[in-house]
From Swiss-Prot:
Part of the Sec protein translocase complex. Interacts with the SecYEG preprotein conducting channel. Has a central role in coupling the hydrolysis of ATP to the transfer of proteins into and across the cell membrane, serving both as a receptor for the preprotein-SecB complex and as an ATP-driven molecular motor driving the stepwise translocation of polypeptide chains across the membrane. It is a peripheral membrane protein. The gene is secA2. GO terms for molecular function: ATP binding; protein-exporting ATPase activity. Belongs to the SecA family. Its EC number is 7.4.2.8. ATP binds at Q114, G132, E133, G134, K135, T136, D539. One of its GO terms (biological process) is intracellular protein transmembrane transport. Keywords: ATP-binding, Cell inner membrane, Cell membrane, Cytoplasm, Membrane, Nucleotide-binding, Protein transport, Translocase, Translocation, Transport. Gene3D superfamilies: P-loop containing nucleotide triphosphate hydrolases (3.40.50.300), SecA, preprotein cross-linking domain (3.90.1440.10). This is Protein translocase subunit SecA 2. It is an enzyme of class 7 (translocase). It comes from Ruegeria pomeroyi (strain ATCC 700808 / DSM 15171 / DSS-3) (Silicibacter pomeroyi). It comes from the Bacteria. It catalyses: ATP + H2O + cellular proteinSide 1 = ADP + phosphate + cellular proteinSide 2.
Length: 652
């Protein structure tokens, strides 16, 4: 019998899954094919289960609140007594109770498709529920059931805004179940963080949970076993911030565990020689500004890398006196200048970062949101600050690091939901042992896809976008214009201003009124320009007039580096059976072509039309392959590092 709620022995002080050994390519290949039957078996949803939940719920609907509370307490007792094997009948009872409590508290009862999605999560799978199908509500079935069974549940969201919003929305429902709910907010004190993680159900972004885990690792040192943890809790009287990794449900799981998994999570502190570091960053920037591409260095935009030529190395040797003494040796000065060139040529303001209050703030390329208190590693952040002429912060010393892949595999039970999992199904299985389950839609989609338009010039594209938005807005339809960067949002806004189209902008540079902008985006005739901030977890509610006029129209102005992100943007329209439409208006000057288009991209763009569209599609696929390879390389390096350090003691 498989475990619905697997767990370690009841006496385990810090429950978590054991670290897995690194796998060779041969091991991965063998595992891929020998485990295929198990993958298919776990990916088989049971429609009969949903029917039983709906049927059982009819009896609960007739009960008073007091009697329903008694049923909840009895269900919790039965679930905890069953330990890891609650059985189908107990799960049906729990789902039906949570569904009825949701109806009374939120005015919403789960559909059969939401029940199927939550059941797949309990099976340890990724439930692919189309955008607009109510994943946030569906998660409460799995989270509430696991918490009633005595498991500490972490609901991982794509960003901090969604964590706070969802926790506030669902707190009343969990209270009806006798469960506590909290959200972990960035910048909270250790005491507030510890209190939040003590709740039965915790909503937090993946980065917040992972960095809390790293802080605990640093605090516990080599005492990672139960005895060491108990000893620490006894003597310092505080214990750890994060009481184990038992049960995780990841909302928008492809964003959290695929897109964000290309860079490791690093916990660091400032160094002692900060002033010398700043001097070196300024000197490296000045030298890099004098070097020329082609003669002194070569850019590899595909790998985001810089390679110095022989001439560049010789020229750098002549200029080494400008560097502080400790940075003059060839390997160190060359690395510093390569980083400075990367800051100048490969990292652009209002695309990769913004300047706010004299500080460089990184923009998450997948969510479009600012990542406060985050910095690039290996001196890149200081190089960008030198380029922008702002105060240079100190390069930080690494205390601990881990990849998202290795972190999430430490959860005893892992599952999640997203609207776009199919493209990453193989990676979910090979890295996380998670099959993908496709859940049918509750209502037939009424979203229409219009023909893609392609221009040779970006200026022509923005003029077309503004013209389309003006016409649709005049007809009473709300319009959402999706952009990749802050700079692109400003270009779209300028084109709309030129035609006198009233609109609002939502981007990393203008995020203060996010909730208000989203709330108004579904009004009849509203025009909204947004980066990926409006691409995930955003439900644009249509008013009656907008619905009658034809619903929301989404305009994608650039292909992203992943088809999944494009699908998420398109999914803002036509949700829950609403009318809607989507189209792409692109250009040969879109940033995907120079980054991933290959050597013939500039030649192809001369022909325009279908040739440019084919080149953009090929560039997108190349970007996806590059990112898959980068994530695999990162995981292999992380596993190898963990193995090499294992002789010093248990690394966690």
């Amino acid at each position: 019998m498989s475990d619905t709620f697997p767990g370690q022995a009841p006496g385990a002080f810090y429950p978590r899954a054991p670290a897995e050994p690194a796998k060779s390519k041969l091991d991965r290949w063998i595992e891929k094919y020998t485990t295929l039957p198990r993958r298919r078996r776990r990916a088989r949803p049971s429609r009969f289960f949903a029917w039983r939940v709906l049927r059982r719920g009819k009896a609960f609907a007739q009960m008073s609140d007091d009697r329903l509370q008694g049923e909840v307490r009895a269900a919790a007792y039965g679930m905890r007594a069953a330990r890891a094997h609650p059985g189908e009948a107990l799960l049906v009872r729990s789902f039906a109770l949570i569904r009825e409590c949701a109806g009374r508290e939120l005015g919403q009862r789960h559909y059969a498709t939401q029940i199927l999605g939550a059941r797949a999560v309990l099976n340890g799978a990724v439930a692919e529920m189309q955008t607009g199908e109510g994943k946030t509500l569906a998660i409460t079935l799995a989270a509430g059931t696991a918490a009633l069974a005595g498991r500490r549940v972490h609901v991982i969201t794509a960003n901090d805004y969604l964590a706070g919003r969802d926790a506030d929305t669902m707190r009343g429902l969990y209270a009806r179940l006798g469960l506590t709910c909290a959200a972990v907010e960035p910048g909270c004190t250790p005491e507030e963080r510890r209190a939040a993680f003590a709740a039965d159900i915790v909503y937090a972004s993946g980065k917040e949970v992972a960095f809390t885990f790293l802080r605990d690792r640093v605090a516990m040192g080599g005492r990672a076993g139960d005895i060491g943890l108990r000893t620490r809790a006894f003597f310092d009287g505080t214990g750890l911030l994060l009481p184990g990794l038992q049960f995780a449900i990841v909302d928008e799981i492809d964003s959290v565990m695929i897109d964000e998994a290309r860079t490791p999570l690093i916990l660091s502190v400032p160094p002692a020689d900060a002033e010398v570091e700043a001097e070196a960053a300024r000197a490296a920037h000045a030298i890099a500004a004098e070097l020329k591409e082609g003669r002194d260095y070569r850019l590899d935009r595909l790998r985001h890398a810089v390679e110095l030529s022989r001439n560049g190395c010789d020229r750098l040797a002549d200029l080494a006196e400008r560097m502080p003494p400790a940075w003059r040796p060839a390997p160190i000065r060359e690395d510093a200048v390569r980083t400075a060139i990367s800051a100048i040529r490969l990292h652009q303001r209002d695309e990769h970062y913004i300047l706010r209050d004299g500080k460089v703030e990184i923009v998450d390329e997948f969510t479009g949101r600012i990542m406060p208190d985050r910095s690039w590693s290996a001196g890149l952040h200081q190089a960008v600050e030198a380029k922008e002429g702002v105060e240079i912060t100190s390069r930080r010393v690494t205390l601990a690091q881990i990849t998202f892949q290795r972190f999430f595999r430490r959860y005893i039970h892992l599952g999640g939901m997203t609207g776009t999992a199919t493209e990453a199904a193989d990676e979910f299985w090979s890295v996380y042992d998670l099959p993908v389950v496709r859940i049918p839609t509750h209502k037939r989609s009424r979203r229409r896809t219009w023909k893609t338009q392609v221009s040779t010039r970006a200026a022509t594209k923005w003029a077309r976008v503004a013209k389309r938005a003006k016409a649709l807005s005049a007809s009473g339809r709300p319009v959402l214009i999706g952009t990749r960067t802050v700079a692109a949002s400003e270009a779209a806004s300028a084109a709309l201003h030129a035609l006198g189209v009233p609109h609002r902008v939502l981007s990393a540079a203008q995020d203060a009124d996010e909730a208000a902008v989203v709330a108004e985006a579904g009004r009849a005739g509203a025009v909204t320009v947004a980066t990926n901030m409006a691409g995930r977890g955003t439900d644009i509610i249509l008013d009656a007039e907008a619905r009658k006029a034809g619903g929301l129209h989404v305009i994608m102005t650039e292909k992203h580096s992943s088809r999944r992100i494009d699908r998420q943007l398109a999914g803002r329209a036509g949700r829950q059976g609403d009318p809607g439409s989507t189209e792409a208006i692109l250009s040969a000057e879109d940033s995907l072509l120079p980054e991933f288009g290959g050597r013939y991209s500039s030649f192809v763009t001369r022909f325009g039309g279908s040739a440019v569209l084919s080149a953009l599609t090929d560039a997108q696929r190349r970007a996806e392959r590059t990112h898959v390879a980068a994530r695999r390389r990162l995981l292999e390096l992380d596993e190898q590092m963990a193995e090499n350090l294992a002789f010093t003691g248990t690394p966690e």
